[in-house]
Amino acid sequence: MVRRLLALSRPLYWLYEKRLLREVKRGPMPRHLGLILDGNRRYARALGLSPTKGHEFGVQKAYEVLEWCLEMGIKTVTVWVFSTDNFKRPPEEVETLMNLFLREAERMAEDHRILEHQVRVRFIGRREGFSPEVVRAIERLERRTEGHRGMFLNIAMGYGGREEIVDAVKRLLLEAEARGLSPKEVAEGLTPEDIARHLYTAGLPDPDFIIRTSGEIRLSGFLLWQSAYSEFYFADVLWPEFRKIDFLRALRSYQARERRFGR
């Protein structure tokens, strides 16, 4: 009986998705979409599986959502996959994630979707905690795609919003010192634009829209500086369960909002 009901509901689901897709495609798209991928471990736990399996499901979902973004014409996407705080997780889980990052960085360098759609991949965050093998793999991927102009994909790995601002200020001060400026001269001339030029995302538009899955209603430090005027959407589903319908509903919500930018 349950299987029969599910079989009957699939055509209705498909029709609804198609209608929603047509509706959303007519509206404005965010230039820069931020994604906080939350809920992999909880998803695995609910199925009685290991956290590793949850992260594997999460990786596949990330590729799927990337394809949706390409379909919708979103030009810049930033996905947060690993925070600075995540290094505090159990060593065996961190090691598993490092192996996953290494595998996927190597795979993405040859992925037909990345190459055909001219996706430029950049990794933002602190790399000190990663193994030399992981760092070499992500640097190779960055070099492989540095000439691409179809989409900018930022992968936030070893990322923390506070750390990003600290790193930006450090770079700014070192640059000023190299130019022979005193601390007083730096302080007197400092502007928000000076900070922005030294962020990991320098040269890219600030995120218009940020989606977080898992039902958690917080940013947890994601793009702290850049999200001053972002719109937010908190989806009450775990990341591996995030469907195209959920994605389209989020975009529809964004399109219905009036952005005032503090005015």
From Swiss-Prot:
Summary of the function given for this chain in its UniProt record: Catalyzes the condensation of isopentenyl diphosphate (IPP) with allylic pyrophosphates generating different type of terpenoids.
NCBIfam families assigned to the protein according to its UniProt record, in alphabetical order: PRK14835.1, uppS
The keyword Ribonucleoprotein belongs to this UniProt entry's keyword annotation: no
Keywords for this protein: Magnesium, Metal-binding, Transferase
Molecular function GO terms recorded: ditrans,polycis-polyprenyl diphosphate synthase [(2E,6E)-farnesyl diphosphate specific] activity; magnesium ion binding
Necessary cofactors: Mg(2+)
EC number(s) reported in the record: 2.5.1.-
Active-site residue numbers: D38, N86
Matching InterPro entries: UPP_synth-like, UPP_synth-like_CS, UPP_synth-like_sf
Co-factor binding comment: Binds 2 magnesium ions per subunit.
Binding-site list for substrate: G39, N40, R41, R42, H55, S83, T84, D85, F87, R89, R212, R218, L219, S220
Gene designation: uppS
Residue positions binding Mg(2+): D38, E231
Family of this protein: Belongs to the UPP synthase family.
Keyword Magnesium among UniProt keywords: yes
Gene3D superfamilies: Decaprenyl diphosphate synthase-like
Protein name in UniProt: Isoprenyl transferase
Organism: Thermus thermophilus (strain ATCC 27634 / DSM 579 / HB8)
GO aspect biological process, one term: polyprenol biosynthetic process
Subunit-structure text: Homodimer.
Pfam families: Prenyltransf
